[in-house]
């Protein structure tokens, strides 16, 4: 392929991926379906359900048009291929055009089916209909959802493609093509998994993401998973009526201090171990008096007199958890991004040390 064709292909691929997954830069620039079609979609705050009925349909149609947009662009970027003349276009490009036309055609048929009887066939409307009283329809349930969404005390978090919204009555997950809805009184919530990420793109700090399974007692309501930062777990529990069950292997860190202690321990584990002389007996940690002392401060600089760290001559007196809590207590709470690289004084002799100087004893 020649240079213009390659350049356009790469540029369009990047645009298509960003348009579908919408990073923060695209949101800031207004290059989203919600912003481009805001006049037709209306306001989410004013009418949550009607907004997402139209948004999911518009998103499906716009995304299905991306292959056709690529073909039209290639007609201009690679004019020598004569793609605009179907009879002269290569066989592979004609097959691609067939696919590019088929996708939006199927999307249009599906959207038409959804919109029948005032959107009664839409998956969101059909889910709401499961909660409707015999003498009312799904519109009455939608009105209740709209009212609760407008309240300022709702719980809302997550990225635009996987938002989690909890109101007084409803648990909802808003994705690119669908809105999952379940009634609080009918659901069982279970924390099934926790994943530790070393760095958060927003704060350069470790972050723990929880996977919570939302399963309704009504078999007709499809179960779904929501993803949540562990620091928001407590706020979610306050909004829910029922307790959240937890799998046996899942440990939840609800505070920044919990996350730091786990990271602190993992970093200390890779430091060189300190061998305790056979004549020395380890005593109980003077911080908690519950476990034996398990760490020793050893300056790791090659030259003992150089660097900001200082040699500590104290015997092992602290356990790993208490030393981590001491380290965290000496940090600036407004600058958590500096915690791992900082130096603090020894709790006993005040010699300054960093995380690299904390060694486990053996």
UniProtKB/Swiss-Prot annotation:
Membrane topology type: Multi-pass membrane protein
Lumenal side: 1-6, 78-94
Sequence intervals crossing the membrane: 7-27, 57-77, 95-115
Assigned GO CC terms: endoplasmic reticulum; endoplasmic reticulum membrane
Compartment(s) of residence: Endoplasmic reticulum membrane
GO biological process: ERAD pathway; protein polyubiquitination; protein ubiquitination; response to unfolded protein; retrograde protein transport, ER to cytosol; ubiquitin-dependent protein catabolic process
Top EC group: transferase
GO molecular function, one term: ubiquitin protein ligase activity
Chain ranges of zinc fingers (RING-type): 285-350
UniProt KW keywords: Endoplasmic reticulum, Membrane, Metal-binding, Transferase, Transmembrane, Transmembrane helix, Ubl conjugation pathway, Unfolded protein response, Zinc, Zinc-finger
Main location per the UniProt record: endoplasmic reticulum
Record topology, Cytoplasmic segments: 28-56, 116-362
EC number: 2.3.2.27
Subunit structure: Integral component of ER-resident dislocation complexes.
Similarity section: Belongs to the TMEM129 family.
Entry domain remark: The RING-type zinc finger domain is responsible for E3 ubiquitin ligase activity.
Functional description taken from the UniProt entry: E3 ubiquitin-protein ligase involved in ER-associated protein degradation, preferentially associates with the E2 enzyme UBE2J2. Exploited by viral US11 proteins to mediate HLA class I proteins degradation.
Protein name: E3 ubiquitin-protein ligase TM129
The organism's taxonomic lineage, starting at the top: Eukaryota, Metazoa, Chordata, Craniata, Vertebrata
């Amino acid at each position: 392929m020649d240079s213009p064709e390659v350049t356009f292909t790469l540029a369009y691929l990047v645009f298509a991926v960003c348009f579908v997954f919408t990073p923060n830069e695209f949101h800031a620039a207004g290059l989203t379906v919600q912003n481009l079609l805001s006049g037709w979609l209306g306001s989410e705050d004013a009418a949550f359900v009607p907004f997402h009925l139209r948004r999911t349909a518009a998103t499906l149609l716009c995304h299905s048009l991306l292959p056709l947009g690529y073909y039209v662009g290639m007609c201009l970027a690679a004019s020598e291929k004569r793609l605009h003349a179907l009879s002269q276009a290569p066989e592979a490009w004609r097959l691609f055009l067939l696919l590019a036309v088929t996708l939006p055609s199927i999307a249009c048929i599906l959207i038409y089916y959804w919109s029948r009887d005032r959107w009664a066939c839409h998956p969101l409307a059909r889910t709401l209909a499961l909660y409707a009283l015999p003498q009312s329809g799904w519109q009455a349930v939608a009105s209740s959802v709209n009212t609760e969404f407008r309240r300022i005390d709702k719980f809302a978090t997550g990225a635009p493609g996987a938002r989690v919204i909890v109101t007084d009555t409803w648990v909802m997950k808003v994705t690119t093509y669908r809105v999952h809805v379940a009634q609080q009184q009918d659901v069982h919530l279970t924390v099934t998994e926790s994943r530790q990420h070393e760095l958060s793109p927003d704060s350069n700090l470790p972050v723990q993401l929880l996977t919570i399974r939302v399963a309704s007692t009504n078999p007709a309501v499809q179960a779904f998973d929501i993803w949540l930062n562990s620091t928001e777990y407590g706020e979610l529990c306050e909004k829910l009526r029922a307790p959240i069950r937890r799998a046996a292997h899942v440990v939840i860190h609800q505070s920044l201090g919990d996350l730091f202690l786990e990271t602190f321990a993992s970093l200390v584990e890779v430091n060189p171990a300190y061998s305790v002389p056979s004549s020395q007996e380890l005593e109980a940690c003077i911080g908690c008096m519950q476990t034996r002392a398990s760490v020793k401060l050893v300056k790791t600089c090659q030259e003992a007199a150089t660097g900001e760290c200082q040699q500590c001559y104290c015997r092992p007196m602290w356990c790993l958890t208490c030393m981590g809590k001491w380290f965290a207590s000496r940090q600036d709470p407004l600058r958590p991004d500096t915690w791992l690289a900082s130096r603090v004084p020894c709790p006993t002799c005040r010699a300054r040390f960093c995380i690299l100087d904390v060694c486990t004893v053996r």
